[in-house]
Swiss-Prot record:
Annotated Gene3D superfamilies: YheA/YmcA-like (1.20.1500.10)
Family annotation (SUPFAM superfamilies): YheA/YmcA-like
Signal peptide segment: none
Superkingdom field: Bacteria
UniProt name for this protein: UPF0342 protein LEUM_1212
Protein family according to the UniProt entry: Belongs to the UPF0342 family.
Protein's organism: Leuconostoc mesenteroides subsp. mesenteroides (strain ATCC 8293 / DSM 20343 / BCRC 11652 / CCM 1803 / JCM 6124 / NCDO 523 / NBRC 100496 / NCIMB 8023 / NCTC 12954 / NRRL B-1118 / 37Y)
InterPro entries tied to this protein: Com_YlbF, YheA/YmcA-like_dom_sf
Length: 117
């Protein structure tokens, strides 16, 4: 019997969309998509996250005015219920995905654990 692991992975992806975690994430995502203010703020927040990550990778320090701007955006994000709901749903979805990854990679992890004995 030939097993096509990609068929199984695609089936898992379809099943994922039926989970409580994915549905909650999709609902939160849609709420932001349908709110121009939340969508704009979330986009700005993502741009800042990317800028911070790039600065960290290149070992640069942000300028004080950048930090002030970033703090102001972060404060707005904390007050936006839709963005907070998305972040909470995303965290739950990521937990599920991590658990699934642990299951899928269990044979590899077990093999490596035998090297330590």
């Amino acid at each position: 019997m030939t097993v096509n692991i990609y068929d199984n992975a695609n089936e898992m992806a379809n099943i994922l969309t039926e989970t409580q975690q994915y549905i909650a994430w999709q609902n939160a995502f849609n709420a932001i998509q349908n709110d121009t203010d939340s969508k704009a703020l979330f986009g700005e927040f993502q741009e800042i996250q990317m800028a911070v990550q790039q600065m960290m990778q290149s070992q640069q320090q942000p300028k004080p005015e950048q930090e002030k701007e970033w703090d102001a955006v972060a404060a707005k994000v904390q007050k936006d219920e839709k963005i907070n709901a998305l972040m909470e749903a995303e965290q739950a979805l990521n937990t599920l995905l991590t658990e699934l990854n642990d299951i899928v990679t269990k044979p590899v992890a077990e093999a490596y654990s035998k090297l330590q004995k």
